[in-house]
């Protein structure tokens, strides 16, 4: 079989272009894994009624996030060694198979195992999907395409709970997972038939020790952050043991990576300024999103008295602003550069999250929606330039690791954010319940788990619980605003001009990613290089 070469031109961008089927398949698979991170939230009551295991249901969320996060760096390295196609196809196949297992689950432990397998498949899709886009489109083309992909991720993540409620109310909670089968199969077939790449075959020394240390260490770190303060106290022996072991394993990992011939996560991704600042921004972005999506709907319902649908619409304003801004981000960063475009976006995100933090007990839903819309505009403007910036400074043989590291940082940020915001909310609630006003002693719940019951009592107890929940949510919203400021600082620290990074082991045959006109940092219209993806599968010869 001879492999054809497609010259990349701006005219061939879009779903109807030659590379359109590949773009559509990547967008579809990305939407599925993003939906599955949140879609089960509103179906939990139906799942528990059917399978039991109420005390175990939090693992449906934790285990998916955990296995997805820890596999991302490994997949990134494998994609740089063996190519994107086999890794991405493997990930989609595992995700679809695991979805079938989840749909047929006979018990809560079985469903948890299925969710773990889903996360293993999702890790490949999350990292390699973005990498494929970086391979088959130039920077100018990615101005539009990455906006599509960022919008798909953001919108799918936030709409997940709404779709989960529809499935569980009108069909069955099992269809939350079974619907992935035909859609995932379409993505799998399209990628197999239409996506090809040329990978230089040579002998590799896989960094097995590094992969094991990174996976186990990060698993324990995320586990400790997610379960600390809920499954066990932060100061308990279990919590200390888990976190100390995680730190020890990750320290050993850095030692191994310094000596590895082909490290699974090269330490230069933490030393190069453009990559370090991009990863810090991604980490903070992951925390910001989990804070808003987790606490804003609950606050709107319990404090403002909104219905579940109204609260969902308020949060959906973020998903409305995100794609609108993302569709224009590319045009903007081609004119003023990655850094400046992202900086404008994060300033808007700071304004939006600050507006949310300023909302009081008697805020109107339109005010909530307005602040979310501004935040969505800001995130839409900043997310695409950040990922394109880090991809554009390395060649094909390093783009998988760079992209995976950025996605990994966002996943770690989600776990850290969930832990920190949860600690803020729980500490505030516990403090207020421990010292109620005169006349309410004995009526106010003694622990945080009694918040829902207190809200349903009515009278002074319910009002105090409402005020307490507002205080807890207010603390979280302030923390999200601070997180947005962290993103702004990271973006401001990015280099003003994006240039190709140089490495000692590069040769003249490496990918030519010379800086292009203006701040974009790459020339449009070049043909794919050796070890690159054409974005289509040529006919058999």
Regions found by a protein language model. Give the residues of each.
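12-transmembrane solute porter fold
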Residues: 19-42, 55-63, 85, 151, ...
């Amino acid at each position: 079989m001879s492999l054809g070469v497609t010259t990349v031109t701006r005219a061939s961008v879009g779903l109807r272009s030659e590379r359109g089927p590949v773009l559509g398949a990547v967008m579809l698979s990305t939407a599925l894994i993003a939906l599955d991170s949140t879609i089960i939230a509103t179906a939990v009551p139906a799942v528990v009624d059917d399978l039991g295991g109420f005390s175990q249901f939090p693992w449906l969320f934790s285990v998916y996030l955990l296995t997805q996060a820890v596999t991302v760096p490994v997949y990134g390295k494998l994609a740089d060694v063996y190519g994107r196609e086999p890794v991405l196809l493997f990930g989609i196949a595992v995700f679809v198979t695991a979805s079938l297992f989840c749909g047929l689950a006979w018990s809560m432990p079985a469903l948890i195992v299925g969710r773990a397998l889903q996360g293993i498949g999702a890790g490949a899709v999350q990292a390699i999907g973005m990498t494929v886009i970086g391979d088959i489109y130039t920077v100018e083309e990615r101005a539009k395409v990455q906006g599509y992909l960022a919008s798909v991720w953001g919108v799918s993540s936030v709409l997940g709970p709404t779709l989960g409620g529809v499935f569980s109310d009108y069909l069955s909670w099992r269809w939350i997972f079974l619907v992935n089968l035909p859609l995932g199969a379409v993505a799998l077939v399209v990628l197999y038939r239409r996506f090809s790449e040329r990978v230089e075959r040579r002998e590799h020394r896989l960094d097995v020790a590094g992969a094991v240390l990174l996976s186990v260490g990060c698993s324990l770190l995320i586990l400790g952050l997610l379960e600390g303060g809920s499954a066990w106290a932060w100061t308990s022996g279990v919590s200390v043991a888990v976190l100390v072991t995680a730190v020890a394993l990750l320290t050993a990992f850095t030692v191994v990576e310094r000596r590895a011939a082909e490290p699974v996560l090269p330490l230069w991704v933490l030393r190069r300024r453009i990559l370090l600042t991009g990863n810090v921004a991604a980490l903070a972005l992951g925390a910001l999103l989990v804070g808003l999506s987790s606490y804003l709907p609950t606050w709107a319902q319990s404090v403002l008295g909104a219905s579940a649908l109204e609260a969902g619409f308020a949060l959906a304003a973020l998903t409305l602003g995100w794609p609108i801004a993302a569709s224009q981000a590319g045009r903007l960063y081609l004119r003023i550069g990655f850094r400046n475009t992202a900086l404008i976006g994060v300033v808007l995100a700071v304004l939006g999250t600050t507006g949310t933090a300023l909302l009081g007990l008697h805020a109107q839903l339109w005010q909530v929606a307005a602040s979310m819309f501004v935040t969505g505009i800001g995130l839409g403007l900043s997310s695409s330039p950040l990922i394109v910036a880090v991809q554009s400074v390395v060649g094909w043989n390093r783009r998988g690791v760079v992209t995976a590291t950025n996605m990994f940082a966002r996943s770690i940020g989600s776990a850290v954010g969930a832990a920190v915001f949860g600690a803020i909310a729980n500490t505030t609630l516990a403090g207020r319940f421990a010292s109620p006003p005169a006349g309410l002693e004995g009526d106010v719940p003694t622990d945080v788990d009694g918040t829902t019951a207190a809200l349903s009592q009515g009278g002074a107890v319910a009002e105090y619980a409402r005020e307490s929940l507002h205080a807890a949510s207010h603390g979280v919203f302030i923390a999200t605003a601070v997180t947005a400021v962290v993103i702004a600082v990271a973006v401001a620290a990015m280099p003003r001009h994006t240039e190709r990074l140089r490495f000692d082991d590069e040769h003249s045959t490496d990918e030519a990613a010379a800086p292009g006109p203006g701040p974009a940092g790459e020339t449009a219209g070049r043909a794919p290089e050796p070890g690159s993806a054409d974005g289509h599968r040529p006919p058999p010869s």
